[in-house]
């Protein structure tokens, strides 16, 4: 590391400490990142304080090639950005070489996926409670929860789409639901026989309630919107999961939406079809499920290739 780079780093850290009150851990983190970049560039004959955009990009590319996480790369760029802004503000440079660089995006965590077995436990418990509930108030809630779950797992709707369904969608025995999704875009999603049956049982009881004719929502409630709040559904789902012997934290409407997509892919559906069913405008959003396809292909080769282990 050249003396000039070393001096520039020390001046920067002194400013961060004296003028901005940076914590010791922050200063040490800045030092590690800046000295690592300086040493790498010095090995190529480049002074960090005089580095250009291409040099900075090269250090980030090296980190990526060495397997550093996107968060580590972003932290390195943040330190360099602060460093060069300091040099610019102090008149040591006429530009900021990091100005047009972007931090690498953090990898999206894989969605939580509930197994087919556990989804089955949830649905079986919901059906049991719907059949056994005797008190009118409990019965309508149990039938509603069963209808919600069967419909969600059959269609993969967003929770906002599900609780906001108009009652007209359940007035027929059609095998498809017309759903209005994000951006007011309509899509057709198939509805299983079990989901249709659960909806009809709920609808029969719903229609017998006073004032039901005046409410346009399939799942009416005393709320600002007039329909069931998604938070209420999520809370009831967690309670059901606990009663089914599952961890309450493992169950949510979003987890069941992911289960719908993942189980379809595991059983042979293609990514484009799942994209359409989920209502994703861009295939890149659906690509979080590619790990499911990879697992399916690996299993396929393992089971059918003559030389597989």
UniProtKB/Swiss-Prot annotation:
The keyword Nucleotide-binding does not apply. One of its GO terms (biological process) is cell division. InterPro entries: CB, DNA_brk_join_enz, Integrase-like_cat_sf, Integrase_catalytic, Integrase_recombinase_N, Integrase_SAM-like_N, Recomb_XerD, Tyrosine_recombinase_XerC/XerD. Its main location: cytoplasm. Keywords: Cell cycle, Cell division, Chromosome partition, Cytoplasm, DNA integration, DNA recombination, DNA-binding. The keyword Lyase does not apply. Induction: It is induced 4 hours after macrophage infection. One of its GO terms (molecular function) is DNA binding. Disulfide bonds: none annotated. Signal peptide: none annotated. Belongs to the 'phage' integrase family. XerD subfamily. This is Tyrosine recombinase XerD. It comes from Brucella abortus (strain 2308). The lineage of its organism: Bacteria, Pseudomonadati, Pseudomonadota, Alphaproteobacteria, Hyphomicrobiales.
